Amino acid sequence: MEKEKNLTQPEEKKSLFFKFIHGIEVVGNKLPQPFYLFSILIVVAIILSVIFAGATATYEKASSAGGAVEVVEVTIKNLLNKDTITYVTQNMYSIYYNFSPMMMMGLLMLSIGLCETTGFFGAFIKRTIGKAKPAVVFAVVAFVAINANTASNAGILGVTAVAGSVFGAMGYNPWLGILLAYAAGNAGMSANVFVGNLDVLISGINESVCAPLGIDISTVHVLQNWYFMGTCAIVLTAVFTWVTVKFVRPFIGEPKDLSLVLQDNATHELTAEERKGLRAAGLSAIIYLAVLVAICIPKNSFFRADNGSILPNSPLLKSVLTLLFLFFLVTGCAYGRKSGFIKKWNELPGLLAKSINSMVNFMVIALPASVFIYLFNASNIPTYLGAVGGGWLKSTGFTGFGLFFLVALLSTFLNLFMTSGSAKWMILAPILIPMLYTIGFSPALTTVAYRIGDSATNAIAPISSDVALIVGLLGKYNTDKSKTPGMGTVFANCMPYAIATFIAEMLILGVWWLLKLPLGPGVSMFVGG
C-alpha cells in the first residue's frame, strides 16, 4: 500500500502543476499572432505619440569612446504629421527590406537551410551522440543539444528524436533522452559555443534600435555575447547532467518494455553514404578555417583594422555573417555531394531556393515589426522612456546587479505567453536598451539578461508549437503502456531544468559582474568600459 501511495504521489504533483500550466496556456492563447500583435503596437505607438507629444526629458549621454558626458534633451514627437506620414508611405519598401534581422536571416538561412535539406545536420547529430560511451551519454546529449540550436528548431528536434532512440538502445528510459535533449536545446538559446540564428537576429534588432538613437554600434555584432554564452554552454552541460541524475531520472523511472525501442534501434546508425559525407564536410571545414586563419595572420591583412588589430573592431568581426554563410555553404555542399544527395551541381540553386521557405513566416512578421520599430524610434518615445526610467533608477540607487535580475525575470515571465525570442526582443529592446544605456550599461549586457530569462522557460512554454511534437515522441518511445504522455509530462519533467538554467546563468552573470569580464570580443558590460 505504501509503495502504491509513493507511486501515485508524483501524479498528484503533476496534476497540480498542470493546473498552473493550463492557466498560462489559456492566457497565452488570448494573445494575437505576432503579425497582428505588431500591427496593434503600430497603432499604440501612434496613439501614445499623440497623447504625449511635446513631453521632454533630459539625460546624460555616456560616450562609448570615453569622452565627456553630454546632457541631452529629448522631446516626444507626434507621428501624425506630414513628414512622417509621407516618409513612411514613400519608403515602406526600404523600411521593410532594410530591416536588419530580415537582411541577415535571408543570407544565413540560404546556407543553414542547405545543411538541413542535405541531411548534414541530422547526420552530424547522429554521429556525435552515437560515439558517446554510456558513462558520459547524459553529458554528451546535453552538450550537443545545447549547441544544436545553431540550426534553430530543426537542430533541437533532431537531437531530441535521436536521443530517444540512443537512450533506449543503451537500456535507459527513452523519455529521459527526449526530455533532456529538448530542455537542453531550448536552454541553448542563451548558451552556445557556436554562433546561431538567434545571435544574428538579436544583433540585427540591437542595431535597428541603437543606430537611430545615436548609440555606438561598433560592439553590436553577432559575437557580442559569445564569451558568456560559451561559458554557459559548458557549465549547463554539467548542471543538466546533475539534474538528470538527481531529479529527472528517478522521477521518470526505469523502462518497462524496450522491445519497441530496440526494433527502432537502427534509426540512429549512420549509413555509409552519411559517413562519407561527414568526412568530406569535416575536411572542408578544416580547410576553410585554415585558409581563414592564414588570411588573418599577416599584419596588413584586409580582415584587420587599420592599426593591425582584430579586436575590438575590425573587418573580420564585421564579416562574421558572410563568413558563417560561406562556412555552412561549403560544408553543406561537401556533405551533399559526397553523400550522394547532390548528384549534379545544377541542383544546388534549387536547394538554396528551397532553404528560403523556412524564413517565410519571419518575413511576414517582419513587415509590421519593421514599421513598428521605425515609428517607435521616430516618436522619440524609447529615448524618453530611457531618460525618465534611467533618471528614476538613478534616484532610487537601484542600478546594480539586481536590476538585471529583474530584467531576466521579466523575460522569463513573458516567455510563457510569447515564445518567439526575436519577437519579444523586438518589443523590449527599444525600451530596455536606451533605458539602461543612459545609466552606463552596454546593449550587450542588457541582451544577456534578457536571453537568460528567455531561454530558461522555453521548454515549459505551453504555447510552443514544439510541445505537440515532443508529446508525439514520448508516445512513440513509451515503454509503459499504463501511462499516456501529455503536455503535463513535458512541463513537469522540464521544470527542474528550467529552474536550474535560470539559477546557473544568473550565478555566471554574477561572476561576470564581479570580475568585469568582457561579454564577447571587444564587448564590455559597461559603456566606455
Summary of predicted features, one role per range:
Residues 4, 31-43, 47, 67-122, ...:
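Core transmembrane alpha-helical segments of multi-pass membrane transporters/permeases
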Residues 1-29, 59-80, 249-276, 525-529:
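Intrinsically disordered, low-complexity non-transmembrane regions of multi-pass membrane transporters
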Residues 51-83, 198-202, 300-308, 379-388, ...:
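Interfacial/capping segments of alpha-helical transmembrane domains
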Residues 105-107, 133-164, 169, 363-369, ...:
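Hydrophobic alpha-helical transmembrane segments of multi-pass integral membrane proteins
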Residues 19-20, 58-98, 212-221, 297-315, ...:
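Interfacial loop/helix-cap signal at membrane boundaries in integral membrane proteins
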Residues 13-31, 88-92, 125, 215-220, ...:
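Cytosolic juxtamembrane amphipathic/interface segments immediately preceding
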